[in-house]
């Protein structure tokens, strides 16, 4: 079996058609994943994540119907710590609001799983999948199913005998990162099916682009810890942190390493300064790509990513100064995903398209 680099002369019209159809399917999955994360962010910001205390993958699609079922669902919520300590005065009407956010988040998760699985079955049954991309495409629905399990594992941290009034920040961060890994994987696959007129960048540019993706992912993880600890509610000043560059109280927990994950002051401090680091690295990356691939699409993409990161930094500052209103919080989270998608697409484009197998 001969393997040749993909170009317009090697791909048959049928191969081109198949790749474009698979791309549409993958982009549909990607859009659904982005929507899920956005709704998940709203679920978190509105304190809705623990409103559904059971995991019913099939029957959970049907919401309560009638007053009796709603009362039954509300009674289940009243058994958890969040209700007992924070929401004792909550009415049924208020409960319905938080219920619908969590329900929408879960239903979207089921929908993207169905789209991924049914699409894979159809493309495989109609023999439209090339052998060299079959395994990666099989991994997509598996990753989505795993992410669904992680979502329930996260919710379980705040129900039952838990003393938490919200989900564990560790599990929240892990849940968001696994969602980002799905987004990275799908973006990488879909961009690999694109036909590029530009030749692949050199190995060093490809490596730098990959590291940029990793740094963006780390910053998103730190942002998830900030969200889980409500750390955006402290140090609502910029550029100084309540008048200091390095504020007091960063190492108040013992052992000291615990501050990295459980001290809201420390977590926000790290999130801020890692953002500065990412800003500098993205600038260096843009100029490095321009030097190694001058006036190329690789260079233009690198500067575009740098520009998007600037916008994201401004959004982060505004979100902090306004003490994380839901609107700005969601915009900031959404832009983080935009940065991630662009960084992954850029990285994949520096490598060229998937090879055509004859």
From Swiss-Prot:
<keyword id="KW-1133">Transmembrane helix</keyword>
<dbReference type="GO" id="GO:0006784">
    <property type="term" value="P:heme A biosynthetic process"/>
</dbReference>
<comment type="function">
    <text>Catalyzes the conversion of heme O to heme A by two successive hydroxylations of the methyl group at C8. The first hydroxylation forms heme I, the second hydroxylation results in an unstable dihydroxymethyl group, which spontaneously dehydrates, resulting in the formyl group of heme A.</text>
</comment>
<feature type="transmembrane region" description="Helical">
    <location>
        <begin position="302"/>
        <end position="322"/>
    </location>
</feature>
<dbReference type="GO" id="GO:0046872">
    <property type="term" value="F:metal ion binding"/>
</dbReference>
<keyword id="KW-0479">Metal-binding</keyword>
<feature type="transmembrane region" description="Helical">
    <location>
        <begin position="107"/>
        <end position="127"/>
    </location>
</feature>
<keyword id="KW-1003">Cell membrane</keyword>
<protein>
    <recommendedName>
        <fullName>Heme A synthase</fullName>
        <ecNumber>1.17.99.9</ecNumber>
    </recommendedName>
</protein>
<feature type="transmembrane region" description="Helical">
    <location>
        <begin position="269"/>
        <end position="289"/>
    </location>
</feature>
<dbReference type="InterPro" id="IPR003780">
    <property type="entry name" value="COX15/CtaA_fam"/>
</dbReference>
<dbReference type="GO" id="GO:0005886">
    <property type="term" value="C:plasma membrane"/>
</dbReference>
<comment type="similarity">
    <text>Belongs to the COX15/CtaA family. Type 2 subfamily.</text>
</comment>
<keyword id="KW-0350">Heme biosynthesis</keyword>
<keyword id="KW-0408">Iron</keyword>
<keyword id="KW-0472">Membrane</keyword>
<feature type="binding site" description="axial binding residue">
    <location>
        <position position="332"/>
    </location>
    <ligand>
        <name>heme</name>
    </ligand>
</feature>
<dbReference type="Pfam" id="PF02628">
    <property type="entry name" value="COX15-CtaA"/>
</dbReference>
<feature type="transmembrane region" description="Helical">
    <location>
        <begin position="133"/>
        <end position="153"/>
    </location>
</feature>
<feature type="binding site" description="axial binding residue">
    <location>
        <position position="271"/>
    </location>
    <ligand>
        <name>heme</name>
    </ligand>
</feature>
<feature type="transmembrane region" description="Helical">
    <location>
        <begin position="208"/>
        <end position="228"/>
    </location>
</feature>
<keyword id="KW-0812">Transmembrane</keyword>
<feature type="transmembrane region" description="Helical">
    <location>
        <begin position="324"/>
        <end position="344"/>
    </location>
</feature>
<keyword id="KW-0560">Oxidoreductase</keyword>
<dbReference type="GO" id="GO:0016653">
    <property type="term" value="F:oxidoreductase activity, acting on NAD(P)H, heme protein as acceptor"/>
</dbReference>
<comment type="subunit">
    <text>Interacts with CtaB.</text>
</comment>
<feature type="transmembrane region" description="Helical">
    <location>
        <begin position="22"/>
        <end position="42"/>
    </location>
</feature>
<feature type="transmembrane region" description="Helical">
    <location>
        <begin position="172"/>
        <end position="192"/>
    </location>
</feature>
<dbReference type="InterPro" id="IPR023754">
    <property type="entry name" value="HemeA_Synthase_type2"/>
</dbReference>
<comment type="pathway">
    <text>Porphyrin-containing compound metabolism; heme A biosynthesis; heme A from heme O: step 1/1.</text>
</comment>
């Amino acid at each position: 079996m001969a393997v040749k680099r993909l170009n317009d002369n090697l791909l048959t019209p049928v191969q081109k058609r198949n790749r474009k159809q698979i791309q549409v399917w993958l982009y549909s999955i990607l859009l659904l994943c982005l929507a899920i994360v956005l709704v998940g962010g709203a679920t978190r910001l509105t304190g809705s994540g623990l409103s559904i205390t059971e995991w019913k993958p099939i029957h959970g699609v049907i919401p309560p119907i009638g007053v009796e079922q709603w009362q039954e669902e509300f009674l289940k919520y009243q058994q958890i710590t969040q209700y007992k300590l924070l929401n004792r005065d909550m009415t049924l009407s208020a409960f319905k609001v938080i219920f619908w956010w969590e329900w929408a988040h879960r239903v979207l998760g089921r929908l993207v799983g169905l789209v991924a699985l049914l699409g894979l079955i159809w493309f495989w049954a109609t023999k439209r999948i090339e052998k060299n991309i079959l395994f990666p495409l099989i991994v997509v629905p598996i990753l989505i199913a795993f992410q669904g399990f992680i979502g329930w594992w996260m919710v379980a941290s705040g129900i039952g005998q838990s003393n938490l009034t919200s989900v564990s920040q560790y599990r929240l961060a892990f849940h968001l990162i696994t969602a980002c890994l799905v987004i990275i994987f799908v973006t990488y696959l879909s961009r690999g099916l694109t036909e590029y007129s530009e030749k692949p960048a050199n190995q060093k540019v490809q490596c730098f682009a990959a590291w940029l993706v990793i740094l963006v992912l780390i910053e998103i993880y730190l942002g998830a810890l900030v969200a889980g600890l409500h750390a955006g509610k402290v140090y609502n000043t910029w550029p100084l942190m309540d008048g200091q560059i390095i504020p007091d109280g960063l190492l108040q927990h013992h052992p000291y390493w615990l501050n990295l994950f459980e001290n809201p002051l420390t977590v926000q401090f790290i999130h801020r300064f890692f953002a500065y680091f990412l800003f500098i690295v993205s600038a260096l990356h843009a100029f490095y790509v321009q030097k190694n691939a001058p006036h190329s699409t690789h260079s233009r993409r690198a500067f575009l990513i740098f520009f998007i990161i600037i916008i994201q930094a401004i959004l982060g500052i505004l979100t902090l100064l306004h003490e994380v209103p839901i609107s700005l919080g969601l915009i900031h989270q959404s832009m983080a995903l935009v940065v991630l998608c662009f960084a992954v697409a850029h990285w994949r484009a520096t490598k060229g398209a998937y090879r055509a197998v004859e």
